[in-house]
UniProtKB/Swiss-Prot annotation:
Signal peptide: none
Coiled coil: none
PANTHER family assigned to the protein according to its UniProt record, in alphabetical order: LIPOYLTRANSFERASE 2, MITOCHONDRIAL-RELATED, OCTANOYLTRANSFERASE
Name of the molecule in the record: Octanoyltransferase
Major site of localization recorded for this protein: cytoplasm
Gene3D superfamilies per record: Bira Bifunctional Protein, Domain 2
Miscellaneous section: In the reaction, the free carboxyl group of octanoic acid is attached via an amide linkage to the epsilon-amino group of a specific lysine residue of lipoyl domains of lipoate-dependent enzymes.
Amino acid sequence: MEQKLIIRQLGIRDYQKTWHEMQEFTDNRTDKSADEIWLVQHPSVFTQGQAGKAEHLLRSTAIPVVQSDRGGQITYHGIGQQIMYVLIDIKRLKTQGRDISVRQLVSALEQSVINTLADYGIESYAKADAPGVYIDGKKICSLGLRIRRGCSFHGLALNINMDLEPFHSINPCGYAGLEMAQLADFVSPQEADCGKVSPKLVEHFVTILGYNKQQIFNIKE
């Protein structure tokens, strides 16, 4: 039996509220629960991953810092950054013949961004030793996942049209001097719009993971 996939359009929402909702969803889901993708933007916030080191926050600012349970180091979220959280029952995918590891899920997320950027004529790439997506050495997309009971939550953050200045207050993802990029550096302001980019991003991701598109349902909240 093919499972439904629910796409939730959450708009702009507080990071901690969304994070706790992801935890609750994952803790309470059953083997019958549909997988979900949450599309959201967060007001300004720095988030530290589980292995996050304090020294990667270079200076104190008015922006709050939240200690998260995702993988990875510190990053920044702000308006104009498209976040895609993937709440997927990985162990169930394996029983359906889609033998996917956590590393393969990370690769699927990276490839969905690479394919999305290619739709705009932008060449990008992933790095085996530093998860994310890059353009000419600059990072345009950050990744961080948590796996609990064989199910994923957290996901990716793709810079679309945002203020990149707060990244200068951190070593992004733990890399000193790492420069950041965004879609608005390469396309018109009209094209660099989260509402236009997110459908392409989702389309590529669900295609890579092999979801039946007749079983995909969009919900705007």
